[in-house]
Amino acid sequence: MKVVFLDRDGTVIQDPLDERVDSLDKIELFPDSIEGLKYLADNDFGVVLITNQAGIAEGRLTEDQFWTIHNEVLTQLAPSGVTFLKTYMNGETGPNATEWRKPGPKMLLQAAEDLDLNLEEIYMVGDNQSDIDAGINAGCKGGILVKTARNKVVESPNAIYSAPNFLDAAQYIVANS
């Protein structure tokens, strides 16, 4: 099975100005993310969502609210025929965060175990250095930085590719797999 690990906020959906997607009205899909997800699906790639949700630890949303928002994202993607194989979420933040929070590798390692994946064949795609580092820490093929997020990193010395948007990242993945 060909799979891509993908961050959500700032990669698939726009980070709001206050930097947390903590309500349904803050969901804004990037148009190119839908195209990129379709492109991957058309080329027989499955997508596993790997997302940090610090808003839970900060008390800005509950885990139930996260899943309500996530289900709305899936509803908005459904007309395009796009879905995710599985979603892994970590709501920790700060000095007490465990290896489950990116850049820690635990969510990626768990996904590989659950879905019987070879990490050396998988790209981790995201808008933040922690996404790239999580892929490296888990032993993935490489990390791809998508330069779409507000107030985030625009270059990563550890990324094997920097893409202006997710569609470009998807095209790179298909061409290099």
Q: Where does each model-flagged region fall?
A:
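Sparse recognition of residues in long alpha-helices and their boundaries
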Residues: D25-K26, L49, V82, N151
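Gly/Ser/Thr-rich beta-alpha loop segments that engage phosphate groups in nucleotides
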Residues: V12, A57, L61, N128
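Active-site neighborhood of HAD-like aspartate-dependent phosphohydrolases
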Residues: M1-G46
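Asp-based, Mg2+/Mn2+-dependent phosphohydrolase catalytic module
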Residues: K2-V4, R8, D64, T68-T83, ...
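Short acidic, glycine/proline-rich loop/turn micro-motifs
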Residues: P16-V21, G59-R60, S156-P157
